[in-house]
């Protein structure tokens, strides 16, 4: 993040949420990226651009491999206690940040940390990048698709599956990738299709008429899914997988019932209580 007011506010919030900041990088020559989000009458969000910056790039475009290398012993210690390394694909729009995430993949592999990728296709980030604005859409898709070969777990939306794989079958998507990852495909309020641990299925997720803001719903879904994967160790049958997906769906829904991508994120306990109420 940039050493600006937004960066400072995030640090305050991270501290309040007890987020480990050991590897947080602050840069004086770039800005914290502030995303402009608009909503329609149904609460569905779309990204309309970014707040103007006085710098030539945003801080997330210059995530430094060298700074992480200086903390390599701390990183190894952290990875010894880590089950999943989670990333999106936006970092690939900058070669500097891309180099860093590939370095982290190397370290994760050494310590058997699994990689979770949320495809999270956001073309506006590429369009506004001084590094990649001139790269064609086809080339962007190719770069991201190659990146997905590092995934042990892949989460993507239905429209992303169509764009990157030309179909929405999670089993076939898994078979097209190097590590044959577990694949979860979301589709808004519609059922989730998945291929997990050699099993394939479709799971209904809870819906509501009171949707306020869908910003952050995908992140909450993935956070809920990962927390359940950790609690199970690894789901071994269809019932356990469906439980993971339903809990993830609850987390996504709860985030949609109020404004904002952070404030509405539910706790594990809140998600569990909500799911129990639905079942009963």
What are these regions, as identified by a protein language model?
Residues 24-25, 118, 158, 258, ...:
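Residue-level detector of family-conserved "landmark" positions at structurally sensitive sites
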Residues 72-75, 144, 211:
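Acidic, amphipathic alpha-helical patches
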Residues 84-174, 182, 190-191:
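Conserved beta-alpha-beta core of the PfkB/ribokinase-like small-molecule kinase fold
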């Amino acid at each position: 993040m940039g050493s600006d007011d937004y960066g400072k506010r995030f640090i305050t919030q991270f501290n309040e949420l007890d987020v480990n900041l050991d590897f947080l990088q602050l840069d004086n020559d770039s800005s914290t990226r502030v995303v402009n989000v608009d909503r329609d009458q149904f609460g569905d969000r779309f990204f309309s651009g970014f707040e103007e910056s006085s710098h030539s790039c945003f801080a997330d475009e210059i995530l430094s491999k060298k700074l992480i290398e200086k903390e390599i012993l701390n990183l190894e210690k952290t990875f010894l206690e880590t089950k999943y390394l989670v990333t999106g694909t936006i970092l690939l729009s900058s070669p500097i940040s891309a180099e860093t995430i590939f370095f982290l993949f190397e370290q994760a592999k050494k310590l058997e940390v699994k990689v979770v990728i949320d495809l999270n296709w956001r073309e506006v980030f590429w369009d506004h990048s001084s590094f990649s604005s001139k790269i064609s859409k086809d080339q962007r898709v190719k770069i991201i698709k190659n990146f997905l070969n590092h995934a042990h777990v892949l989460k993507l939306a239905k429209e992303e599956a169509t764009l990157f794989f030309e179909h929405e079958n999670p089993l076939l998507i898994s078979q097209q990738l190097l590590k044959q990852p577990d694949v979860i495909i979301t589709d808004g309020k519609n059922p989730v299709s998945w291929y997990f641990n050699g099993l394939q299925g479709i799971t209904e997720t809870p819906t509501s008429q009171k949707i306020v803001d869908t910003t952050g719903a995908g992140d909450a879904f993935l956070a809920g899914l990962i927390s359940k994967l950790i609690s199970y160790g690894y789901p071994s049958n269809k019932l356990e997988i469906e439980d993971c997906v339903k809990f993830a769906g609850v987390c996504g829904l709860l985030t949609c019932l109020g404004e904002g991508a952070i404030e509405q994120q539910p706790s594990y306990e809140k998600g569990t209580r909500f799911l129990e109420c639905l079942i009963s």
